[in-house]
Amino acid sequence: MITTKELRNKFINYFESKNHSHQPSSSLIPFGDDTLLFTNAGMVQFKDVFLGIEKKDFSRAVTVQKCLRAGGKHNDLDNVGYTARHHTFFEMLGNFSFGDYFKKEAISFAWEFLTKEIKLPVEKLWVTIYASDDEAFDVWHKHIGLAKERIIRIDSSDNFWSMGDTGPCGPCTEIFYDHGEDVAGGLPGTPEQDGDRYIEIWNIVFMQYNRHADGSTTDLPKPSVDTGMGLERISAVLQNVHSNYEIDLFQALIKKAQQVTHAKDINSPSLKVIADHIRACAFLIADGVLPANEGRGYVLRRIIRRAIRHGNKVGAKEIFFYKLVAELVSQMGEAYSQLIDKRELIEKTLIKEEELFLKTIENGIKIFDAEIENLKDNTISGEVAFKLYDTYGFPFDLTADMAREKGLKVDEQAFLAQMQIQKQRSKEAGKFNVDYNSLINSQVKSEFRGYSTLIEDAKVLEIYQDGQLVASTSEQVSAVVVLDKTPFYAESGGQVGDKGILEGIGFEFVVEDVQKSGEAILHIGKLVKGRLNLNDELTARVSDKPRLATAANHSATHLLHKALKLVLGGHAEQKGSLVDENRLRFDFTHDKAISRSEIEQIELLVNQQIRANYPVTTIETSQQKAKSLGAEALFGEKYGDIVRVISMGDFSIELCGGTHVAYTGDIGLFKVTSEGSIASGVRRIEAVTADKAIRHTFTNENKIIAIKDSLKANDTNLIDKIKSMLEQIKNQEKQIAKLKKELLSGSSNDIKETNIGDIKVVVANVDGVDVKTLRNKIDDYKSKNTKVIAVLTTTNADKVQFVIGVSNALTTLIKAGDIAKELSSHIDGKGGGRADMAQGGGNNSANIDQALSQVEKFILNNIKE
């Protein structure tokens, strides 16, 4: 039996023998493509190559691509574990031609691999083609020799692929494997095609047309090929099993899942869910995603929590999910070294997330059970699903899973509506960003000269004004200018674009920002003098002070990154950065606040490297060579075949396209200004360098001097004086609280109490106390009376504050939250809470006595009913 590992290697080796360049899998996070949540196909990393935006030094490629379908349009999550072939994470085998070979070669390669390399029986294979693709038919029938009746023409979108509404598109041919007569299902194109007998194993897309906005198509000058074959699916065929979950890789994970959950039934769908989900979670974390309540992090959290729920369902009594990582590394670590490199981070993240979830799941399940008891039909409302998500951290899928097990469904549309309301509520006004890619012809190329010079003579290639290509621009008009060569650095890798001027005979253009679009460098700014025309010769001059300050901050981020790893551990991976002339901001993975001692160690390490005055050296080399040198590749960055390696002594080696100082000593001084959390498992450090670091130190020293002067203290006794003052404040606050309690006790004689049968009703206003004191008094009433309803208010100027308590035994008669609403309506206020306790406030204290009288009537009417 051929193993999954052997099949993966066999595919790569076969296409390498056919002169294909083996390219590593790209990240599950698509670079620079906001249209995709996750990489879901092998062609994603080559999208710009197919579009003609990006050029490669090879025209044939082979990949084994990590893919994920668990969010957005491509979402298989609900089916995972319950069908034979649905997965969140999967591996896509693919071979690609970029204007090289076409239909004859692509079909021949696929047929040879299937029938000769892995020896599938010819009689088990069927193919489909697009109905009008006679060329593909001829290749299959005349060149391959496949019988006509085994070639099925399909006149639908199943056999025609497009990248979008416009752009490259073309027909497909698909190869199917026949599992035999004992499996239900019919041939593709028949009413029974959805059965499992005939399974698609390879899809070959012929990109030969360009679709225009009006729907018409024209031939592409260089047709290309994009193919995909699921590794899990073809492994199942070769291992003679019907379900992907029966292949060697999944069986190892399922056995481990059974071991760590103590499940009794090895065939439980829950074990398949866990085996599938550990792959998705581990690879997402390795690619830099961490659990969160939105975006990709939310998808990861959903998958983790779904796996945990299924573990609990089959018997897991303790944290278990992270225990599958070791087996996953054993199965896939050889093919994906990132699993080995990031194993500690993966395990720590899963442990933390499972601990967090277990704290909330018990309460959430109680709420879920309580809600379904009161259901009038078989549908759980979207409001309840949202409450479980928002309050208890239940992903929608988990609520839907629990509902499905009880024969119920969830109103997903209403849930999504609630999500949209929340999103609108928290949405911040964002800046308007021009889509420069839509403005610039992708063939325009600018040469960057800014590593070695800040001044360059250049020629104007294009001018854009209000999104339109123009021949010239006039004074005081904003525009985008593209040059043939430039010293201006375009924003990239967290470093902001340069500022400066473009000047020539009779004109001056102020550059306010610089961006990239394909291979074009865009100078964005305003013409402040004269007139600028196409083909004008000019001098491009970068402002040196901002550039040098930015370079110092950028170099400091490299030193900081290394220092973080040394002080906090290797898991401290960069998650993002911002570098400009004023400061640096650095985001990294770490699951707790950094102590003052750790910050001091980090600052000390960075400043030691600055004082050492190491030369900052640059080499350009292959990615493989850079990796052998130990260079750090940063999350979220896309690197070319040749990369730029920045070294600072032996301390820091990173791939980087940014600008840097010549010596570490040029950074001057490094000082952390803030540290905090920006997301679950992600911390942010902000820092300053050089003169700004010195000024920051001066500012802090001046604050300390001002504090010493105010307290009449010196360096020796300052801390003791502050401690003494805080102790005095603490004692005085205790005394104030005591006096307020005595005041309330003294007022108790004036508080009106009414007894309705065995129910005590207390409604009163007490001046001169705070809400905490009122709350304590309410608790006192409830502890001394099994049936009490208490409403206490206090006023200060026009303001009213109130606390309401209802004994648990009475909440079926009247709820504290309902009383709060009634009181609020009389005092221009708002309030709410639980059935047994509520509080709030209002802006009209003038008629507090009348308001309390109305509230008392409201209470009496409710309890008498």
Curated annotation (Swiss-Prot):
Gene name of the encoded protein: alaS
Catalytic activity: tRNA(Ala) + L-alanine + ATP = L-alanyl-tRNA(Ala) + AMP + diphosphate
SMART domains: tRNA_SAD (SM00863)
Record organism: Francisella tularensis subsp. tularensis (strain WY96-3418)
Domain comment as written in the entry: Consists of three domains; the N-terminal catalytic domain, the editing domain and the C-terminal C-Ala domain. The editing domain removes incorrectly charged amino acids, while the C-Ala domain, along with tRNA(Ala), serves as a bridge to cooperatively bring together the editing and aminoacylation centers thus stimulating deacylation of misacylated tRNAs.
Cofactor note: Binds 1 zinc ion per subunit.
Superkingdom of origin: Bacteria
Keyword Ligase applies: yes
RNA-binding in keyword set: yes
Gene3D superfamilies named in the record: 2.40.30.130, 3.10.310.40, 3.30.54.20, 6.10.250.550, Bira Bifunctional Protein, Domain 2 (3.30.930.10), Threonyl-trna Synthetase, Chain A, domain 2 (3.30.980.10)
Residues that bind Zn(2+): 554, 558, 656, 660
InterPro entries tied to this protein: aa-tRNA-synth_II/BPL/LPL (IPR045864), Ala-tRNA-lgiase_IIc (IPR002318), Ala-tRNA-ligase_IIc_anticod-bd (IPR018162), Ala-tRNA-synth_IIc_core (IPR018165), Ala-tRNA-synth_IIc_N (IPR018164), Ala-tRNA_ligase (IPR050058), Ala_tRNA_ligase_euk/bac (IPR023033), DHHA1_dom (IPR003156)
Matching Pfam families: DHHA1 (PF02272), tRNA-synt_2c (PF01411), tRNA_SAD (PF07973)
Cofactors (names): Zn(2+)
Keywords: Aminoacyl-tRNA synthetase, ATP-binding, Cytoplasm, Ligase, Metal-binding, Nucleotide-binding, Protein biosynthesis, RNA-binding, tRNA-binding, Zinc
Enzyme Commission designation: 6.1.1.7
Subcellular location(s) of the protein: Cytoplasm
Name of this chain's protein: Alanine--tRNA ligase
NCBIfam families: alaS (TIGR00344)
UniProt record similarity statement: Belongs to the class-II aminoacyl-tRNA synthetase family.
GO biological process terms held by the UniProt record: alanyl-tRNA aminoacylation; negative regulation of DNA-templated transcription
